[in-house]
Amino acid sequence: MLKLIVKNGYVIDPSQNLEGEFDILVENGKIKKIDKNILVPEAEIIDAKGLIVCPGFIDIHVHLRDPGQTYKEDIESGSRCAVAGGFTTIVCMPNTNPPIDNTTVVNYILQKSKSVGLCRVLPTGTITKGRKGKEIADFYSLKEAGCVAFTDDGSPVMDSSVMRKALELASQLGVPIMDHCEDDKLAYGVINEGEVSALLGLSSRAPEAEEIQIARDGILAQRTGGHVHIQHVSTKLSLEIIEFFKEKGVKITCEVNPNHLLFTEREVLNSGANARVNPPLRKKEDRLALIEGVKRGIIDCFATDHAPHQTFEKELVEFAMPGIIGLQTALPSALELYRKGIISLKKLIEMFTINPARIIGVDLGTLKLGSPADITIFDPNKEWILNEETNLSKSRNTPLWGKVLKGKVIYTIKDGKMVYKD
């Protein structure tokens, strides 16, 4: 029997309302016991004194670029970033080449991630064949192969009849539709429509591009009974629309990218193309509304939208590929809300663990007895810098490059096996 004890840590597990100093006994990859002063002579010991111990983090929005664009990232490099950031499970988006609209690609991803053996990689399937927005993909075979949700992420589904059909099918299968809400007739530009786009003379992406689609798909979710999950929510009005539907009992959830909590559109003036992302960084009032949405529970989870691009793809704002890496910086970014007294550590951990697990319908994000021993151990006060030495991605596109970050994962354990040590 393989046995491991995580000793002396401060354990926080929102799924069980558990908080305090405990030891955790792991046996054969499962949580065996949580108690004070566990003694098992033959067990391996991890001393977590002074550290936070919680369920393994789950990121339900990651771009691994594999297959097809592995010069930016691949399953191995992305998995290394994930475990360094405390993520034991990640959900990969289907805008690969070829896209995840067939079981061959699903099997490739699952087999390669198993071979890498770091974090759990769960694929999503496309809503439409080729992500072209016209013909529904084969949801049944994709789910059977291992897809946990469906999305055309990176592109909106503009045809309302297609989205309605997708929600109906997903409802039958008990999986969510992950919704990239940007009306492409209003979101054809580069950065947020506002003072910075005017100052720089750049084409813009109107906030109503997001808001209109959220309203439409909230109505469709209400009519079909399907679960719509709004990706990377970014505006104040978007949150008000989501709250409206939640109050009516509609199956609607949403995520926020930590970058939208940290930065406004003005970050483009500092970081240039590394601050270009879709949906774009918004105004201060939107950022503050998102923070309030986290505090009030309107926003269900954090999700990085980890989107790697090479330096040559990020040279000029107007021609740059949109996206920011985030797997290694998610924890210190979210901890800024804790340090400012906006949310508790328990709330922060809830948004990284049990909440995303519930959204995708997996029995993870918990330390309950018998569950997979996915454990993240972190120091909320350790300072570090994201640079050439610490970055594990193939790409470096983030406004946080070279910045001092506070909060560091020390150990990541997946299925009882240590997959990362600082």
Swiss-Prot record:
Question: Keyword annotations for this protein?
Answer: Hydrolase, Metal-binding, Pyrimidine biosynthesis, Zinc
The biological processes this protein is annotated with in GO are: 'de novo' UMP biosynthetic process; purine nucleobase catabolic process
- CDD domains linked: DHOase_IIa
Q: What does this protein do?
A: Catalyzes the reversible cyclization of carbamoyl aspartate to dihydroorotate.
- Keyword Metal-binding recorded: yes
Q: Under which pathway is this protein filed? A: Pyrimidine metabolism; UMP biosynthesis via de novo pathway; (S)-dihydroorotate from bicarbonate: step 3/3
For this chain, the family text in UniProt reads: Belongs to the metallo-dependent hydrolases superfamily. DHOase family. Class I DHOase subfamily.
State the top-level EC class: hydrolase
Q: Name one GO cellular component term.
A: cytoplasm
Q: Which Pfam families match?
A: Amidohydro_1 (PF01979)
Q: Where is the active site?
A: 305
Chain sites annotated for binding Zn(2+): 61, 63, 153, 305
Q: What PROSITE patterns does the record tag this protein with?
A: DIHYDROOROTASE_1 (PS00482), DIHYDROOROTASE_2 (PS00483)
InterPro entries linked: Amidohydro-rel (IPR006680), DHOase (IPR004722), DHOase/Allantoinase_Hydrolase (IPR050138), Dihydroorotase_CS (IPR002195), Metal-dep_hydrolase_composite (IPR011059), Metal_Hydrolase (IPR032466)
Q: Which gene encodes it?
A: pyrC
| EC annotation from Swiss-Prot or TrEMBL | 3.5.2.3
Name the catalysed reactions: (S)-dihydroorotate + H2O = N-carbamoyl-L-aspartate + H(+)
What is the native source organism of this protein?
Aquifex aeolicus (strain VF5)
Give me the comment on cofactor binding: Binds 1 Zn(2+) ion per subunit. Fully functional with a mononuclear metal center. Does not require a second metal for activity, although the conservation of the second metal-binding site during evolution leaves open the possibility that a second ion might bind in vivo.
Which residues make up the binding site for substrate?
Answer: 63-65, 95, 278, 309, 322-323
Activity control: The monomer has very low activity by itself. Activated several thousandfold by formation of a complex with PyrB aspartate carbamoyltransferase (ATCase).
What's the subunit arrangement here?
Monomer. Forms a 1:1 stoichiometric complex with PyrB. The complex exists as an equilibrium mixture of heterohexamers, composed of 3 PyrC and 3 PyrB subunits, and dodecamers. The complex has both DHOase and ATCase activities.
A GO term, aspect molecular function? zinc ion binding
> Which cofactors, if any, are listed as required?
Zn(2+)
Query: What is the protein name for this chain?
Result: Dihydroorotase
Matching entries from SUPFAM superfamilies are given as:
Composite domain of metallo-dependent hydrolases (SSF51338), Metallo-dependent hydrolases (SSF51556)
